[in-house]
Amino acid sequence: MKRIQAIVFDMDGVLIDSEELHAHAKRIAFAHAGIALSDVDLRSYVGRSDAVMIDEIGARHGLTDGQRSTVLNEKARIYEQEEHGIKIVPGAIEFVRWAAQHYRLALATSATPRNRTATLNRLGIANLFEATADLGDVSEPKPSPEIYLTVTARLALQPSQCLVVEDALTGVLSAKRAGCCVSALIRTFAADELLGAGADFIFEDFQSLKRSAEIEAYCN
């Protein structure tokens, strides 16, 4: 029996090219609160939940709880208004459909339950995932391992039996801390950063990942 029994996907940046819209919505929401976000601010929180980012940056700038809540709601409103324009990561859906023929599939995302459901339905692949975990399922978001421990438990598999597909440093850290084998798509972060965070292997596009023999080799 092959060691890898399931593939667990991140969503933002892996299945959908949403990071630019997330950044746009965050900039506007924070600007309305009098805070100008830098590129460093935005990059530092790629893969982390909006709530964590808004709490930490809001605290540094002295925002009250009410003001932080306003920023969070404004960011969500802008994202939801413009999400129809989000593009799919090239090759992602084809890879998911291929993987579903060879492995069990799951999803572990820092997105809200609403965004997770809306995205999978829009992509037409919700039925391919046996298990999902999102921000509403955990008390500690990525880079805590909780989300990957949650979704692998829902699959009734050990983390070591699962290959994770991530693109962000926080996601790689989360999956490695859970004990998963981790592949990382080179998009927002450079190869050396992803490997430095603990990725077992990296890939530039989904076509290069579409070889089960290589997956087994990298994860053993």
State where each predicted segment sits.
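Helix-loop "lid/cap" segments that line or gate small-molecule binding pockets
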Residues: 29-30, 49-64, 119, 151-152
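Short, acidic loop-to-helix structural element flanking the phosphoryl-transfer center
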Residues: 3, 81-107, 111-113, 117
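Asp-based, Mg2+/Mn2+-dependent phosphohydrolase catalytic module
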Residues: 1-5, 97, 112-220
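Helix N-cap/coil-helix junction residues
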Residues: 35-37, 63, 125, 156-157
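Residue-level detector of anion-binding/catalytic polar loops
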Residues: 36, 104-105, 181, 200
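Metal-dependent phosphoesterase signature
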Residues: 58-94
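Active-site neighborhood of HAD-like aspartate-dependent phosphohydrolases
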Residues: 1-43
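Structured helix-beta-strand junction loops
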Residues: 48, 101-102, 197-198
